[in-house]
A protein has these predicted regions:
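Transmembrane alpha-helices and adjacent helix-loop boundaries
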Residues: 1-226
């Protein structure tokens, strides 16, 4: 068996374990918190009084306009200067969540704003409250449009979690770095790490296509019923 293949096989369990233990939870939790934050920020931009909307615009401006790596460094290495000390994983989780929240807020705001105002008026005309109109009329239509860009954000986040290695989170890429430090085989190991990320991204992309097809059929049923 070739040396490179032997090394890849021997390293695979450690890499997969790091991915399962850190990369996957970090991705899922960051996206969940970021999506909730983004939804709240989008609603604030669209419906809250001016000062609150301005505060959200400032937050989005900061986190979309600065590099994610810099944000992670500020949280993990910078905050201790003012007495706020975080472990690596919570620091990464906060950084990724805030970053995802900024991007998803713009996606959600755009898709909510794209729903015709007549849908709101129709909902109010049959006695629905704002919450009922949002939950039963607006969100189902907006979700169909939001899934592709939100899915792309999630897939990008899977790859972005490799930046957590810079603040010592022992995720997939960091595990690869440690193996490189003992084997002195950077090309083989980093190719293997890249292939794992590629497989993850490909699986998620395939799932995205299936979800989009189902939503497209659902949208067709709605249009036919209308």
């Amino acid at each position: 068996m070739p040396h490179w293949l032997t090394l890849m096989i021997e390293s695979l369990p450690s890499l997969l374990w790091a991915g399962l233990l850190f990369t996957v939870p970090l991705t899922i939790l960051s996206f969940a918190f970021g999506l909730a934050l983004g939804f709240g920020a989008a609603l604030t931009r669209l419906f809250a009084p001016g000062p609150f909307a301005t505060a959200v615009r400032f937050y989005v401006w900061i986190f979309r306009g600065t590099p994610l790596l810099v944000q992670l460094f500020l949280i993990f290495y910078g905050l201790p200067s003012v007495g706020i000390v975080l472990d690596a994983f919570p620091a990464a989780l906060i950084g990724f969540s805030l970053n995802v929240g900024a991007y998803t807020s713009e996606i959600i705001r755009a898709v909510l704003a794209s729903v015709p105002k007549g849908q709101w008026e129709a909902a109010y005309s049959v006695g629905m409250t704002w919450v009922e109109a949002m939950g039963r009329i607006i969100l189902p239509q907006a979700a169909r449009v939001a899934v592709p860009p939100l899915s792309n954000t999630f897939i990008a986040l899977v790859k972005d979690t490799s930046l957590a290695a810079a603040i010592t989170v022992p995720e997939l890429f960091r595990a690869g770095q440690r193996i490189v430090a003992t084997t002195y085989e950077p090309l083989i190991l980093y190719v293997e790490v890249a292939l794992i990320y590629l497989v993850l991204s490909s699986v998620l992309s395939s799932l995205q296509v299936r979800v989009e097809k189902r939503l497209s059929r659902y949208g067709g049923y709605l249009e036919a019923a209308a």
